C-alpha cells in the first residue's frame, strides 16, 4: 500500500481521535466515510459502497450535506455515534489542504433539534459507584438535570423509569450488572472526566462525581459551553410509588410486551395531551405515582374541575393546540442554537397565555399544582414587533425582521429590492436590444451576475457590438458580463451582504433579550404541561366513563365494577364484564382459581392499574373506588426465559417473587400469577403455599394470587386473611363458556382440555388427554381416599412422606405427566409437534 494522500492523512488523524464514532468527513457538498466506517455506514443506511484510490482500494461512501440529517438520525436510532468534521475554510480561497475540525459529536443521548421525538424526553445518564450508586441524568434539549443516590436494585428500577438513550460511566461495572443495564439501553460508554469541562456548582460533594461526569461528556460532545444546564436538582424516589422494572413491564405501563411500543399500554389511553410538554409529563406521571395524599387529591380536584366544566376544557384544549414546545424552545435559546422560526413558534405560544390565564382566573384555588401563570407580555410584544411570521430557519440568510422594526434594515432592504428591480428592467431591455427573447440574467457565487444566451441564438448575434464580454462557456449556452452590470453588482451585493450581516446581529440581540426571560419561560412550560395533563385526564375520564376515586386514609381497597382500562377499549361497548375487589385488614389475600383464558390475569392487572391511575391523579374505570396509598406494587405475571442473562423461566419467576417477598410491606400490593409452573407439581405446590403463608403471616400485603393448584383452596380454612375467589365458566353441550365474572369460592375444574380444544389442538390429542385425565383423577381419588387436603403449614415443603415408596413413585409419575400436559405451549405447537408430544406422553405411560 502506498503512502496516504495529505487529505487521507488528515482523515486518519481525526479518526484516531474519535475511534468510537462514525466520522462524517466534509468534502465539498458531501460527507464522506472511509475504511470500516464506510462499510458499516453503507450496510446500515443501505447506500452504495464504492472505492477511492484504486491503487489502495479504500472503501468509501457518502451522503449529501444538505440531507445528512436524515442519515445521521438513522444511525443514531441504531445506537451509533457520529462525529461531524467540517471544512473550516473556503476551498476556493485556500491553496493546499483545507483545514477541517470535528465540530460536534452526535450520540443517542445528546441529540438535539428535530432528530428526537417531541413527545418523549431524551435522557442521557451517568452512573457512579462508591458505597452506593449515584445516578445523574439530563435531557440536553431542555437543560433538565436531576441526580439521586440509590442501592443497585433501586438504581436499576430508576433507570427503567428514566429510560435513558445512553449511559456514561467511568468505572468498571461487573458483567451481571451490565447485562441488567442492557435490558434498558444498549448504549453504554466509558468516559473519563476532564478538568477543563464544566463542573457542577451547588451540588453535594457526594453527588459531584456523577454530575461532573455527565456534564463533562455532554460538553465534550457538544464542544461548547452548557449555559442551559444551570441547575442539578436532587430528588429521592421514595416520594413516589415504587414500581420495579418487572411491574412496569408486566403491567405494560408505557411499552407493550409483544410489540415494544405504546400500542396496548396505559400510556396509549392517556395519550390525549395537546402539547409536547404534556405528553412527556404524562409518561412521567404514569411511571411515578404519588405517595402524598394531598398532592394526589389536588390532581383529582383539577380533573374534576375540567369534568364539571366542559366548555372550559374545550376552550383550554383549543388554546393548547396552538402552543409549541416552550420547554425545548427555551433550551435552544439558552444553548444558542435557536432559529428565527423557533422564536416565531415561541411568539405563537405566548399568544395563548392571556387566554389560558383568563380561563383559569376563577379557579386558582382548584389548580393548586400551578405556580403563577404569567403571560410574559413584554416578551410577546417584542417578538410580535420584530419577527416576520414566515421567518426562515437559517439566521444568516436574512428575511427575519419586519419592515419598520429597524431603520437601517429598511434602508438596506430598499437598496437591495431596487437593485433586483433594476436587474429585471435590464433583462427586458437586453432582450429587446438583442432580439433574443430567451436571454436571462442569472447569478452564482463564482461569477456574480451574468447574461446568459443559448448557443442557438448566438449564431447570428455579434456580441461584441453589444459590449458583451464572454465569461463562461456551457454545453448549450454562453455567459457574458458588461461594465454596467458589474457596476450595479457591487451596489446590489453590497446592500444584500450588509443587510444579512445586520439582521444576524439584530437576531443575536433579540436572542439575548429572550434569555432574560428564561426562568419564567421554563416555569410557564411546566404550568402548561401540568394543565395539559389534567385536561387530558378529564378528556379520557369523560370518554371512557371513569369516576373520581376516594383516597382512603385506611388500608381498605374497595373497587366496584372495575374494568381493565386498555382491554375494554378493544371490545364492543358494554361487552366488558366488570368485577369487584374488596381487600382490607381482615381479608387481604385473594386466592384466585379458574380456567385458562377465563380472565384471571386481566382481573389482577386491572386492580393494579386502577391503583396506579388513582395515585397518579387520574380517574379510574369503575363505578366506585376507595383506594389506599400503596407504597409499592410487585408483579409476577407471565413466563419468559431471560435470554440476556441465560436464566430459565422458573429462575426468572423465583427472582421476581424474591424481589416482592423481600421488599413488600403491609402497604404494598402483590400480584402473583401461577407461581410454581416451571417445576414439578409438588415443588410448585409447596413453593406456592409457602409464599402465601409468608405473605399472610410475615408481610400482610394486599395480594392477588392466581393458581392452578386446587389443593391450595383449603388454605382459606387456616389463614384468616385469605379468601377464595374464582373466575366463572360453565360447560354447555360439551363446550366451555367463559363468563369472566369473579365469584366467591374456588372453581371445581381447570378446564385445561377444553381450552386446548378451543385452541384447535388435534382431535386425537384432545381425546387421548381426556382419557388420561379421567384415569389420573380416578387414581388421585383412590390415593387420597377421596379427600383433598392441603399440605399442613408445619409440613416440610420439599419432602413427600409416603409409606409405600413404589406407590408414591407411580403417583408422582402421574403428576409429572399431568404437569407435562399442562405445560404444553399451545400457541407455539404445530400439528406435527403435537403428535410427537402425544407419542412422548404415551411412551411415559407405558
From Swiss-Prot:
GO terms for biological process: mismatch repair. SUPFAM superfamilies: DNA repair protein MutS, domain I, DNA repair protein MutS, domain II, DNA repair protein MutS, domain III, P-loop containing nucleoside triphosphate hydrolases. GO terms for molecular function: ATP binding; ATP-dependent DNA damage sensor activity; damaged DNA binding; mismatched DNA binding. ATP binds at residues 594-601. InterPro entries: DNA_mismatch_repair_MutS, DNA_mismatch_repair_MutS-lik_N, DNA_mismatch_repair_MutS/MSH, DNA_mismatch_repair_MutS_C, DNA_mismatch_repair_MutS_clamp, DNA_mismatch_repair_MutS_core, DNA_mismatch_repair_MutS_N, DNA_mismatch_repair_MutS_sf. Pfam families: MutS_I (PF01624), MutS_II (PF05188), MutS_III (PF05192), MutS_IV (PF05190), MutS_V (PF00488). Keywords: ATP-binding, DNA damage, DNA repair, DNA-binding, Nucleotide-binding. The keyword DNA damage applies. GO terms for cellular component: cytosol. PANTHER family: DNA MISMATCH REPAIR PROTEIN MSH1, MITOCHONDRIAL, DNA MISMATCH REPAIR PROTEIN MUTS FAMILY MEMBER. Belongs to the DNA mismatch repair MutS family. This protein is involved in the repair of mismatches in DNA. It is possible that it carries out the mismatch recognition step. This protein has a weak ATPase activity. NCBIfam families: mutS1, PRK05399.1. This is DNA mismatch repair protein MutS. It comes from Macrococcus caseolyticus (strain JCSC5402). The gene is mutS.
Amino acid at each position: 500500500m502506498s503512502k496516504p494522500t495529505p487529505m487521507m492523512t488528515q482523515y486518519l488523524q481525526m479518526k484516531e481521535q474519535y475511534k468510537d464514532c462514525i466520522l462524517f468527513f466534509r468534502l465539498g457538498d458531501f460527507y464522506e466515510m472511509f475504511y470500516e466506517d464506510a462499510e458499516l455506514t453503507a450496510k446500515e443506511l443501505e447506500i452504495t459502497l464504492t472505492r477511492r484510490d484504486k491503487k489502495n482500494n479504500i472503501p468509501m461512501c457518502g451522503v449529501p450535506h444538505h440531507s445528512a440529517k436524515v442519515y445521521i438520525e438513522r444511525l443514531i436510532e441504531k445506537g451509533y455515534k457520529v462525529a461531524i468534521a467540517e471544512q473550516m475554510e473556503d476551498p476556493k480561497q485556500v491553496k493546499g489542504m483545507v483545514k477541517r475540525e470535528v465540530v460536534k459529536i452526535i450520540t443517542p443521548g445528546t441529540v438535539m433539534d428535530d432528530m428526537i421525538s417531541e413527545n418523549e424526553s431524551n435522557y442521557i445518564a451517568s452512573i457512579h459507584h462508591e458505597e452506593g450508586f449515584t445516578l445523574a441524568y439530563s435531557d440536553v434539549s431542555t437543560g433538565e438535570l436531576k441526580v439521586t443516590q440509590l442501592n443497585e436494585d433501586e438504581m436499576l428500577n430508576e433507570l427503567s423509569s428514566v429510560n435513558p438513550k445512553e449511559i456514561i460511566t467511568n468505572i468498571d461495572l461487573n458483567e451481571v450488572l451490565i447485562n441488567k443495564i442492557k435490558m434498558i439501553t444498549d448504549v453504554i460508554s466509558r468516559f473519563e472526566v476532564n478538568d477543563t469541562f464544566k463542573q457542577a456548582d451547588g451540588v453535594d460533594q457526594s453527588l459531584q462525581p456523577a454530575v461532573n461526569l455527565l456534564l463533562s461528556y455532554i460538553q465534550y460532545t457538544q464542544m461548547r459551553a452548557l449555559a442551559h444546564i444551570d441547575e442539578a436538582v436532587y430528588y429521592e424516589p421514595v416520594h413516589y410509588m415504587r414500581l420495579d422494572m418487572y411491574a412496569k413491564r408486566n403491567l405494560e405501563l408505557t411499552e407493550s410486551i409483544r410489540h415494544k411500543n405504546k400500542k396496548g399500554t396505559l400510556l396509549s389511553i392517556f395519550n390525549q395531551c395537546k402539547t409536547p410538554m404534556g405528553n412527556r409529563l404524562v409518561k412521567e406521571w404514569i411511571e411515578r405515582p404519588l405517595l402524598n395524599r394531598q398532592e394526589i387529591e389536588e390532581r383529582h380536584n383539577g380533573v374534576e374541575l375540567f369534568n364539571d366544566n366542559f366548555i372550559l376544557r374545550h376552550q383550554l384544549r383549543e388554546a393548547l393546540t396552538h402552543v409549541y414546545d416552550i420547554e425545548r424552545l427555551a433550551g435552544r435559546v439558552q444553548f444558542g442554537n435557536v432559529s428565527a422560526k423557533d422564536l416565531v413558534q415561541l411568539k405563537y405560544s405566548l399568544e395563548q397565555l392571556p387566554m389560558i390565564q383568563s380561563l383559569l382566573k376563577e379557579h386558582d384555588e382548584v389548580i393548586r399544582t400551578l405556580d403563577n401563570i404569567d403571560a410574559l407580555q413584554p416578551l410577546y410584544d417584542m417578538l410580535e414587533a420584530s419577527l416576520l411570521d414566515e421567518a426562515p430557519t437559517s439566521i444568516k440568510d436574512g428575511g427575519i425582521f419586519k419592515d419598520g422594526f429597524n431603520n437601517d434594515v429598511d434602508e438596506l432592504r430598499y437598496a437591495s429590492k431596487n437593485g433586483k428591480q433594476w436587474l429585471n428592467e435590464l433583462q427586458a431591455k437586453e432582450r429587446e436590444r438583442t432580439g433574443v427573447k430567451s436571454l436571462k440574467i442569472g447569478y452564482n457565487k463564482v461569477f456574480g451576475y451574468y447574461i446568459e444566451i443559448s448557443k442557438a441564438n448566438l449564431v447570428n448575434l455579434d456580441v461584441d457590438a453589444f459590449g458583451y464580454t464572454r465569461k463562461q462557456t456551457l454545453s448549450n449556452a454562453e455567459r457574458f458580463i458588461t461594465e454596467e452590470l458589474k457596476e450595479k453588482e457591487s451596489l446590489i451585493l453590497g446592500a444584500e451582504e450588509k443587510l444579512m450581516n445586520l439582521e444576524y446581529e439584530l437576531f443575536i440581540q433579540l436572542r439575548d433579550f429572550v434569555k432574560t426571560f428564561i426562568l419564567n419561560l421554563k416555569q410557564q412550560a411546566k404550568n402548561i404541561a401540568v394543565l395539559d395533563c389534567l385536561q387530558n385526564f378529564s378528556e379520557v375520564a369523560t370518554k371512557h366513563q371513569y369516576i373520581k376515586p376516594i383516597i382512603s386514609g385506611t388500608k381498605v381497597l374497595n373497587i366496584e365494577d372495575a374494568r381493565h382500562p386498555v382491554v375494554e377499549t378493544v371490545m364492543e361497548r358494554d361487552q366488558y364484564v366488570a368485577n369487584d375487589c374488596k381487600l382490607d385488614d381482615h381479608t387481604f389475600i385473594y386466592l384466585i382459581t379458574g380456567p385458562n383464558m377465563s380472565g384471571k390475569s386481566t382481573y389482577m392487572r386491572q386492580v393494579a392499574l386502577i391503583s396506579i391511575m388513582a395515585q397518579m391523579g387520574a380517574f379510574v374505570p369503575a363505578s366506585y373506588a376507595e383506594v389506599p396509598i400503596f407504597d409499592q406494587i410487585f408483579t409476577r405475571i407471565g413466563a419468559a426465559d431471560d435470554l440476556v442473562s441465560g436464566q430459565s423461566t422458573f429462575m426468572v419467576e423465583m427472582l421476581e417473587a424474591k424481589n416482592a417477598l423481600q421488599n413488600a410491606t403491609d402497604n404494598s400490593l402483590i400480584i402473583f400469577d401461577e407461581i410454581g409452573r416451571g417445576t414439578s407439581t409438588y415443588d410448585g405446590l409447596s413453593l406456592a403455599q409457602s409464599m402465601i403463608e409468608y405473605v399472610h403471616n410475615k408481610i400482610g400485603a394486599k395480594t392477588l394470587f392466581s393458581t392452578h393448584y386446587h389443593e391450595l383452596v383449603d388454605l382459606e380454612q387456616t389463614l384468616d386473611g385469605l379468601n377464595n375467589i374464582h373466575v366463572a365458566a360453565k360447560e354447555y353441550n360439551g363446550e366451555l363458556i367463559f363468563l369472566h365474572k369473579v365469584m366467591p369460592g374456588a372453581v371445581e375444574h381447570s378446564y385445561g382440555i377444553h381450552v386446548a380444544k378451543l385452541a384447535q389442538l388435534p382431535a386425537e390429542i384432545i381425546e387421548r388427554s381426556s382419557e388420561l385425565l379421567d384415569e389420573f383423577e380416578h387414581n388421585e381419588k383412590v390415593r387420597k381416599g377421596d379427600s383433598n387436603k392441603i399440605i399442613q403449614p408445619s409440613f416440610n415443603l420439599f419432602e413427600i412422606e409416603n409409606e409405600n415408596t413404589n406407590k408414591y413413585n407411580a403417583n408422582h409419575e402421574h403428576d409429572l405427566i399431568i404437569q407435562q400436559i399442562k405445560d404444553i405451549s399451545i400457541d407455539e405447537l404445530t400439528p406435527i409437534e403435537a403428535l410427537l408430544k402425544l407419542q412422548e406422553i404415551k411412551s411415559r405411560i407405558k
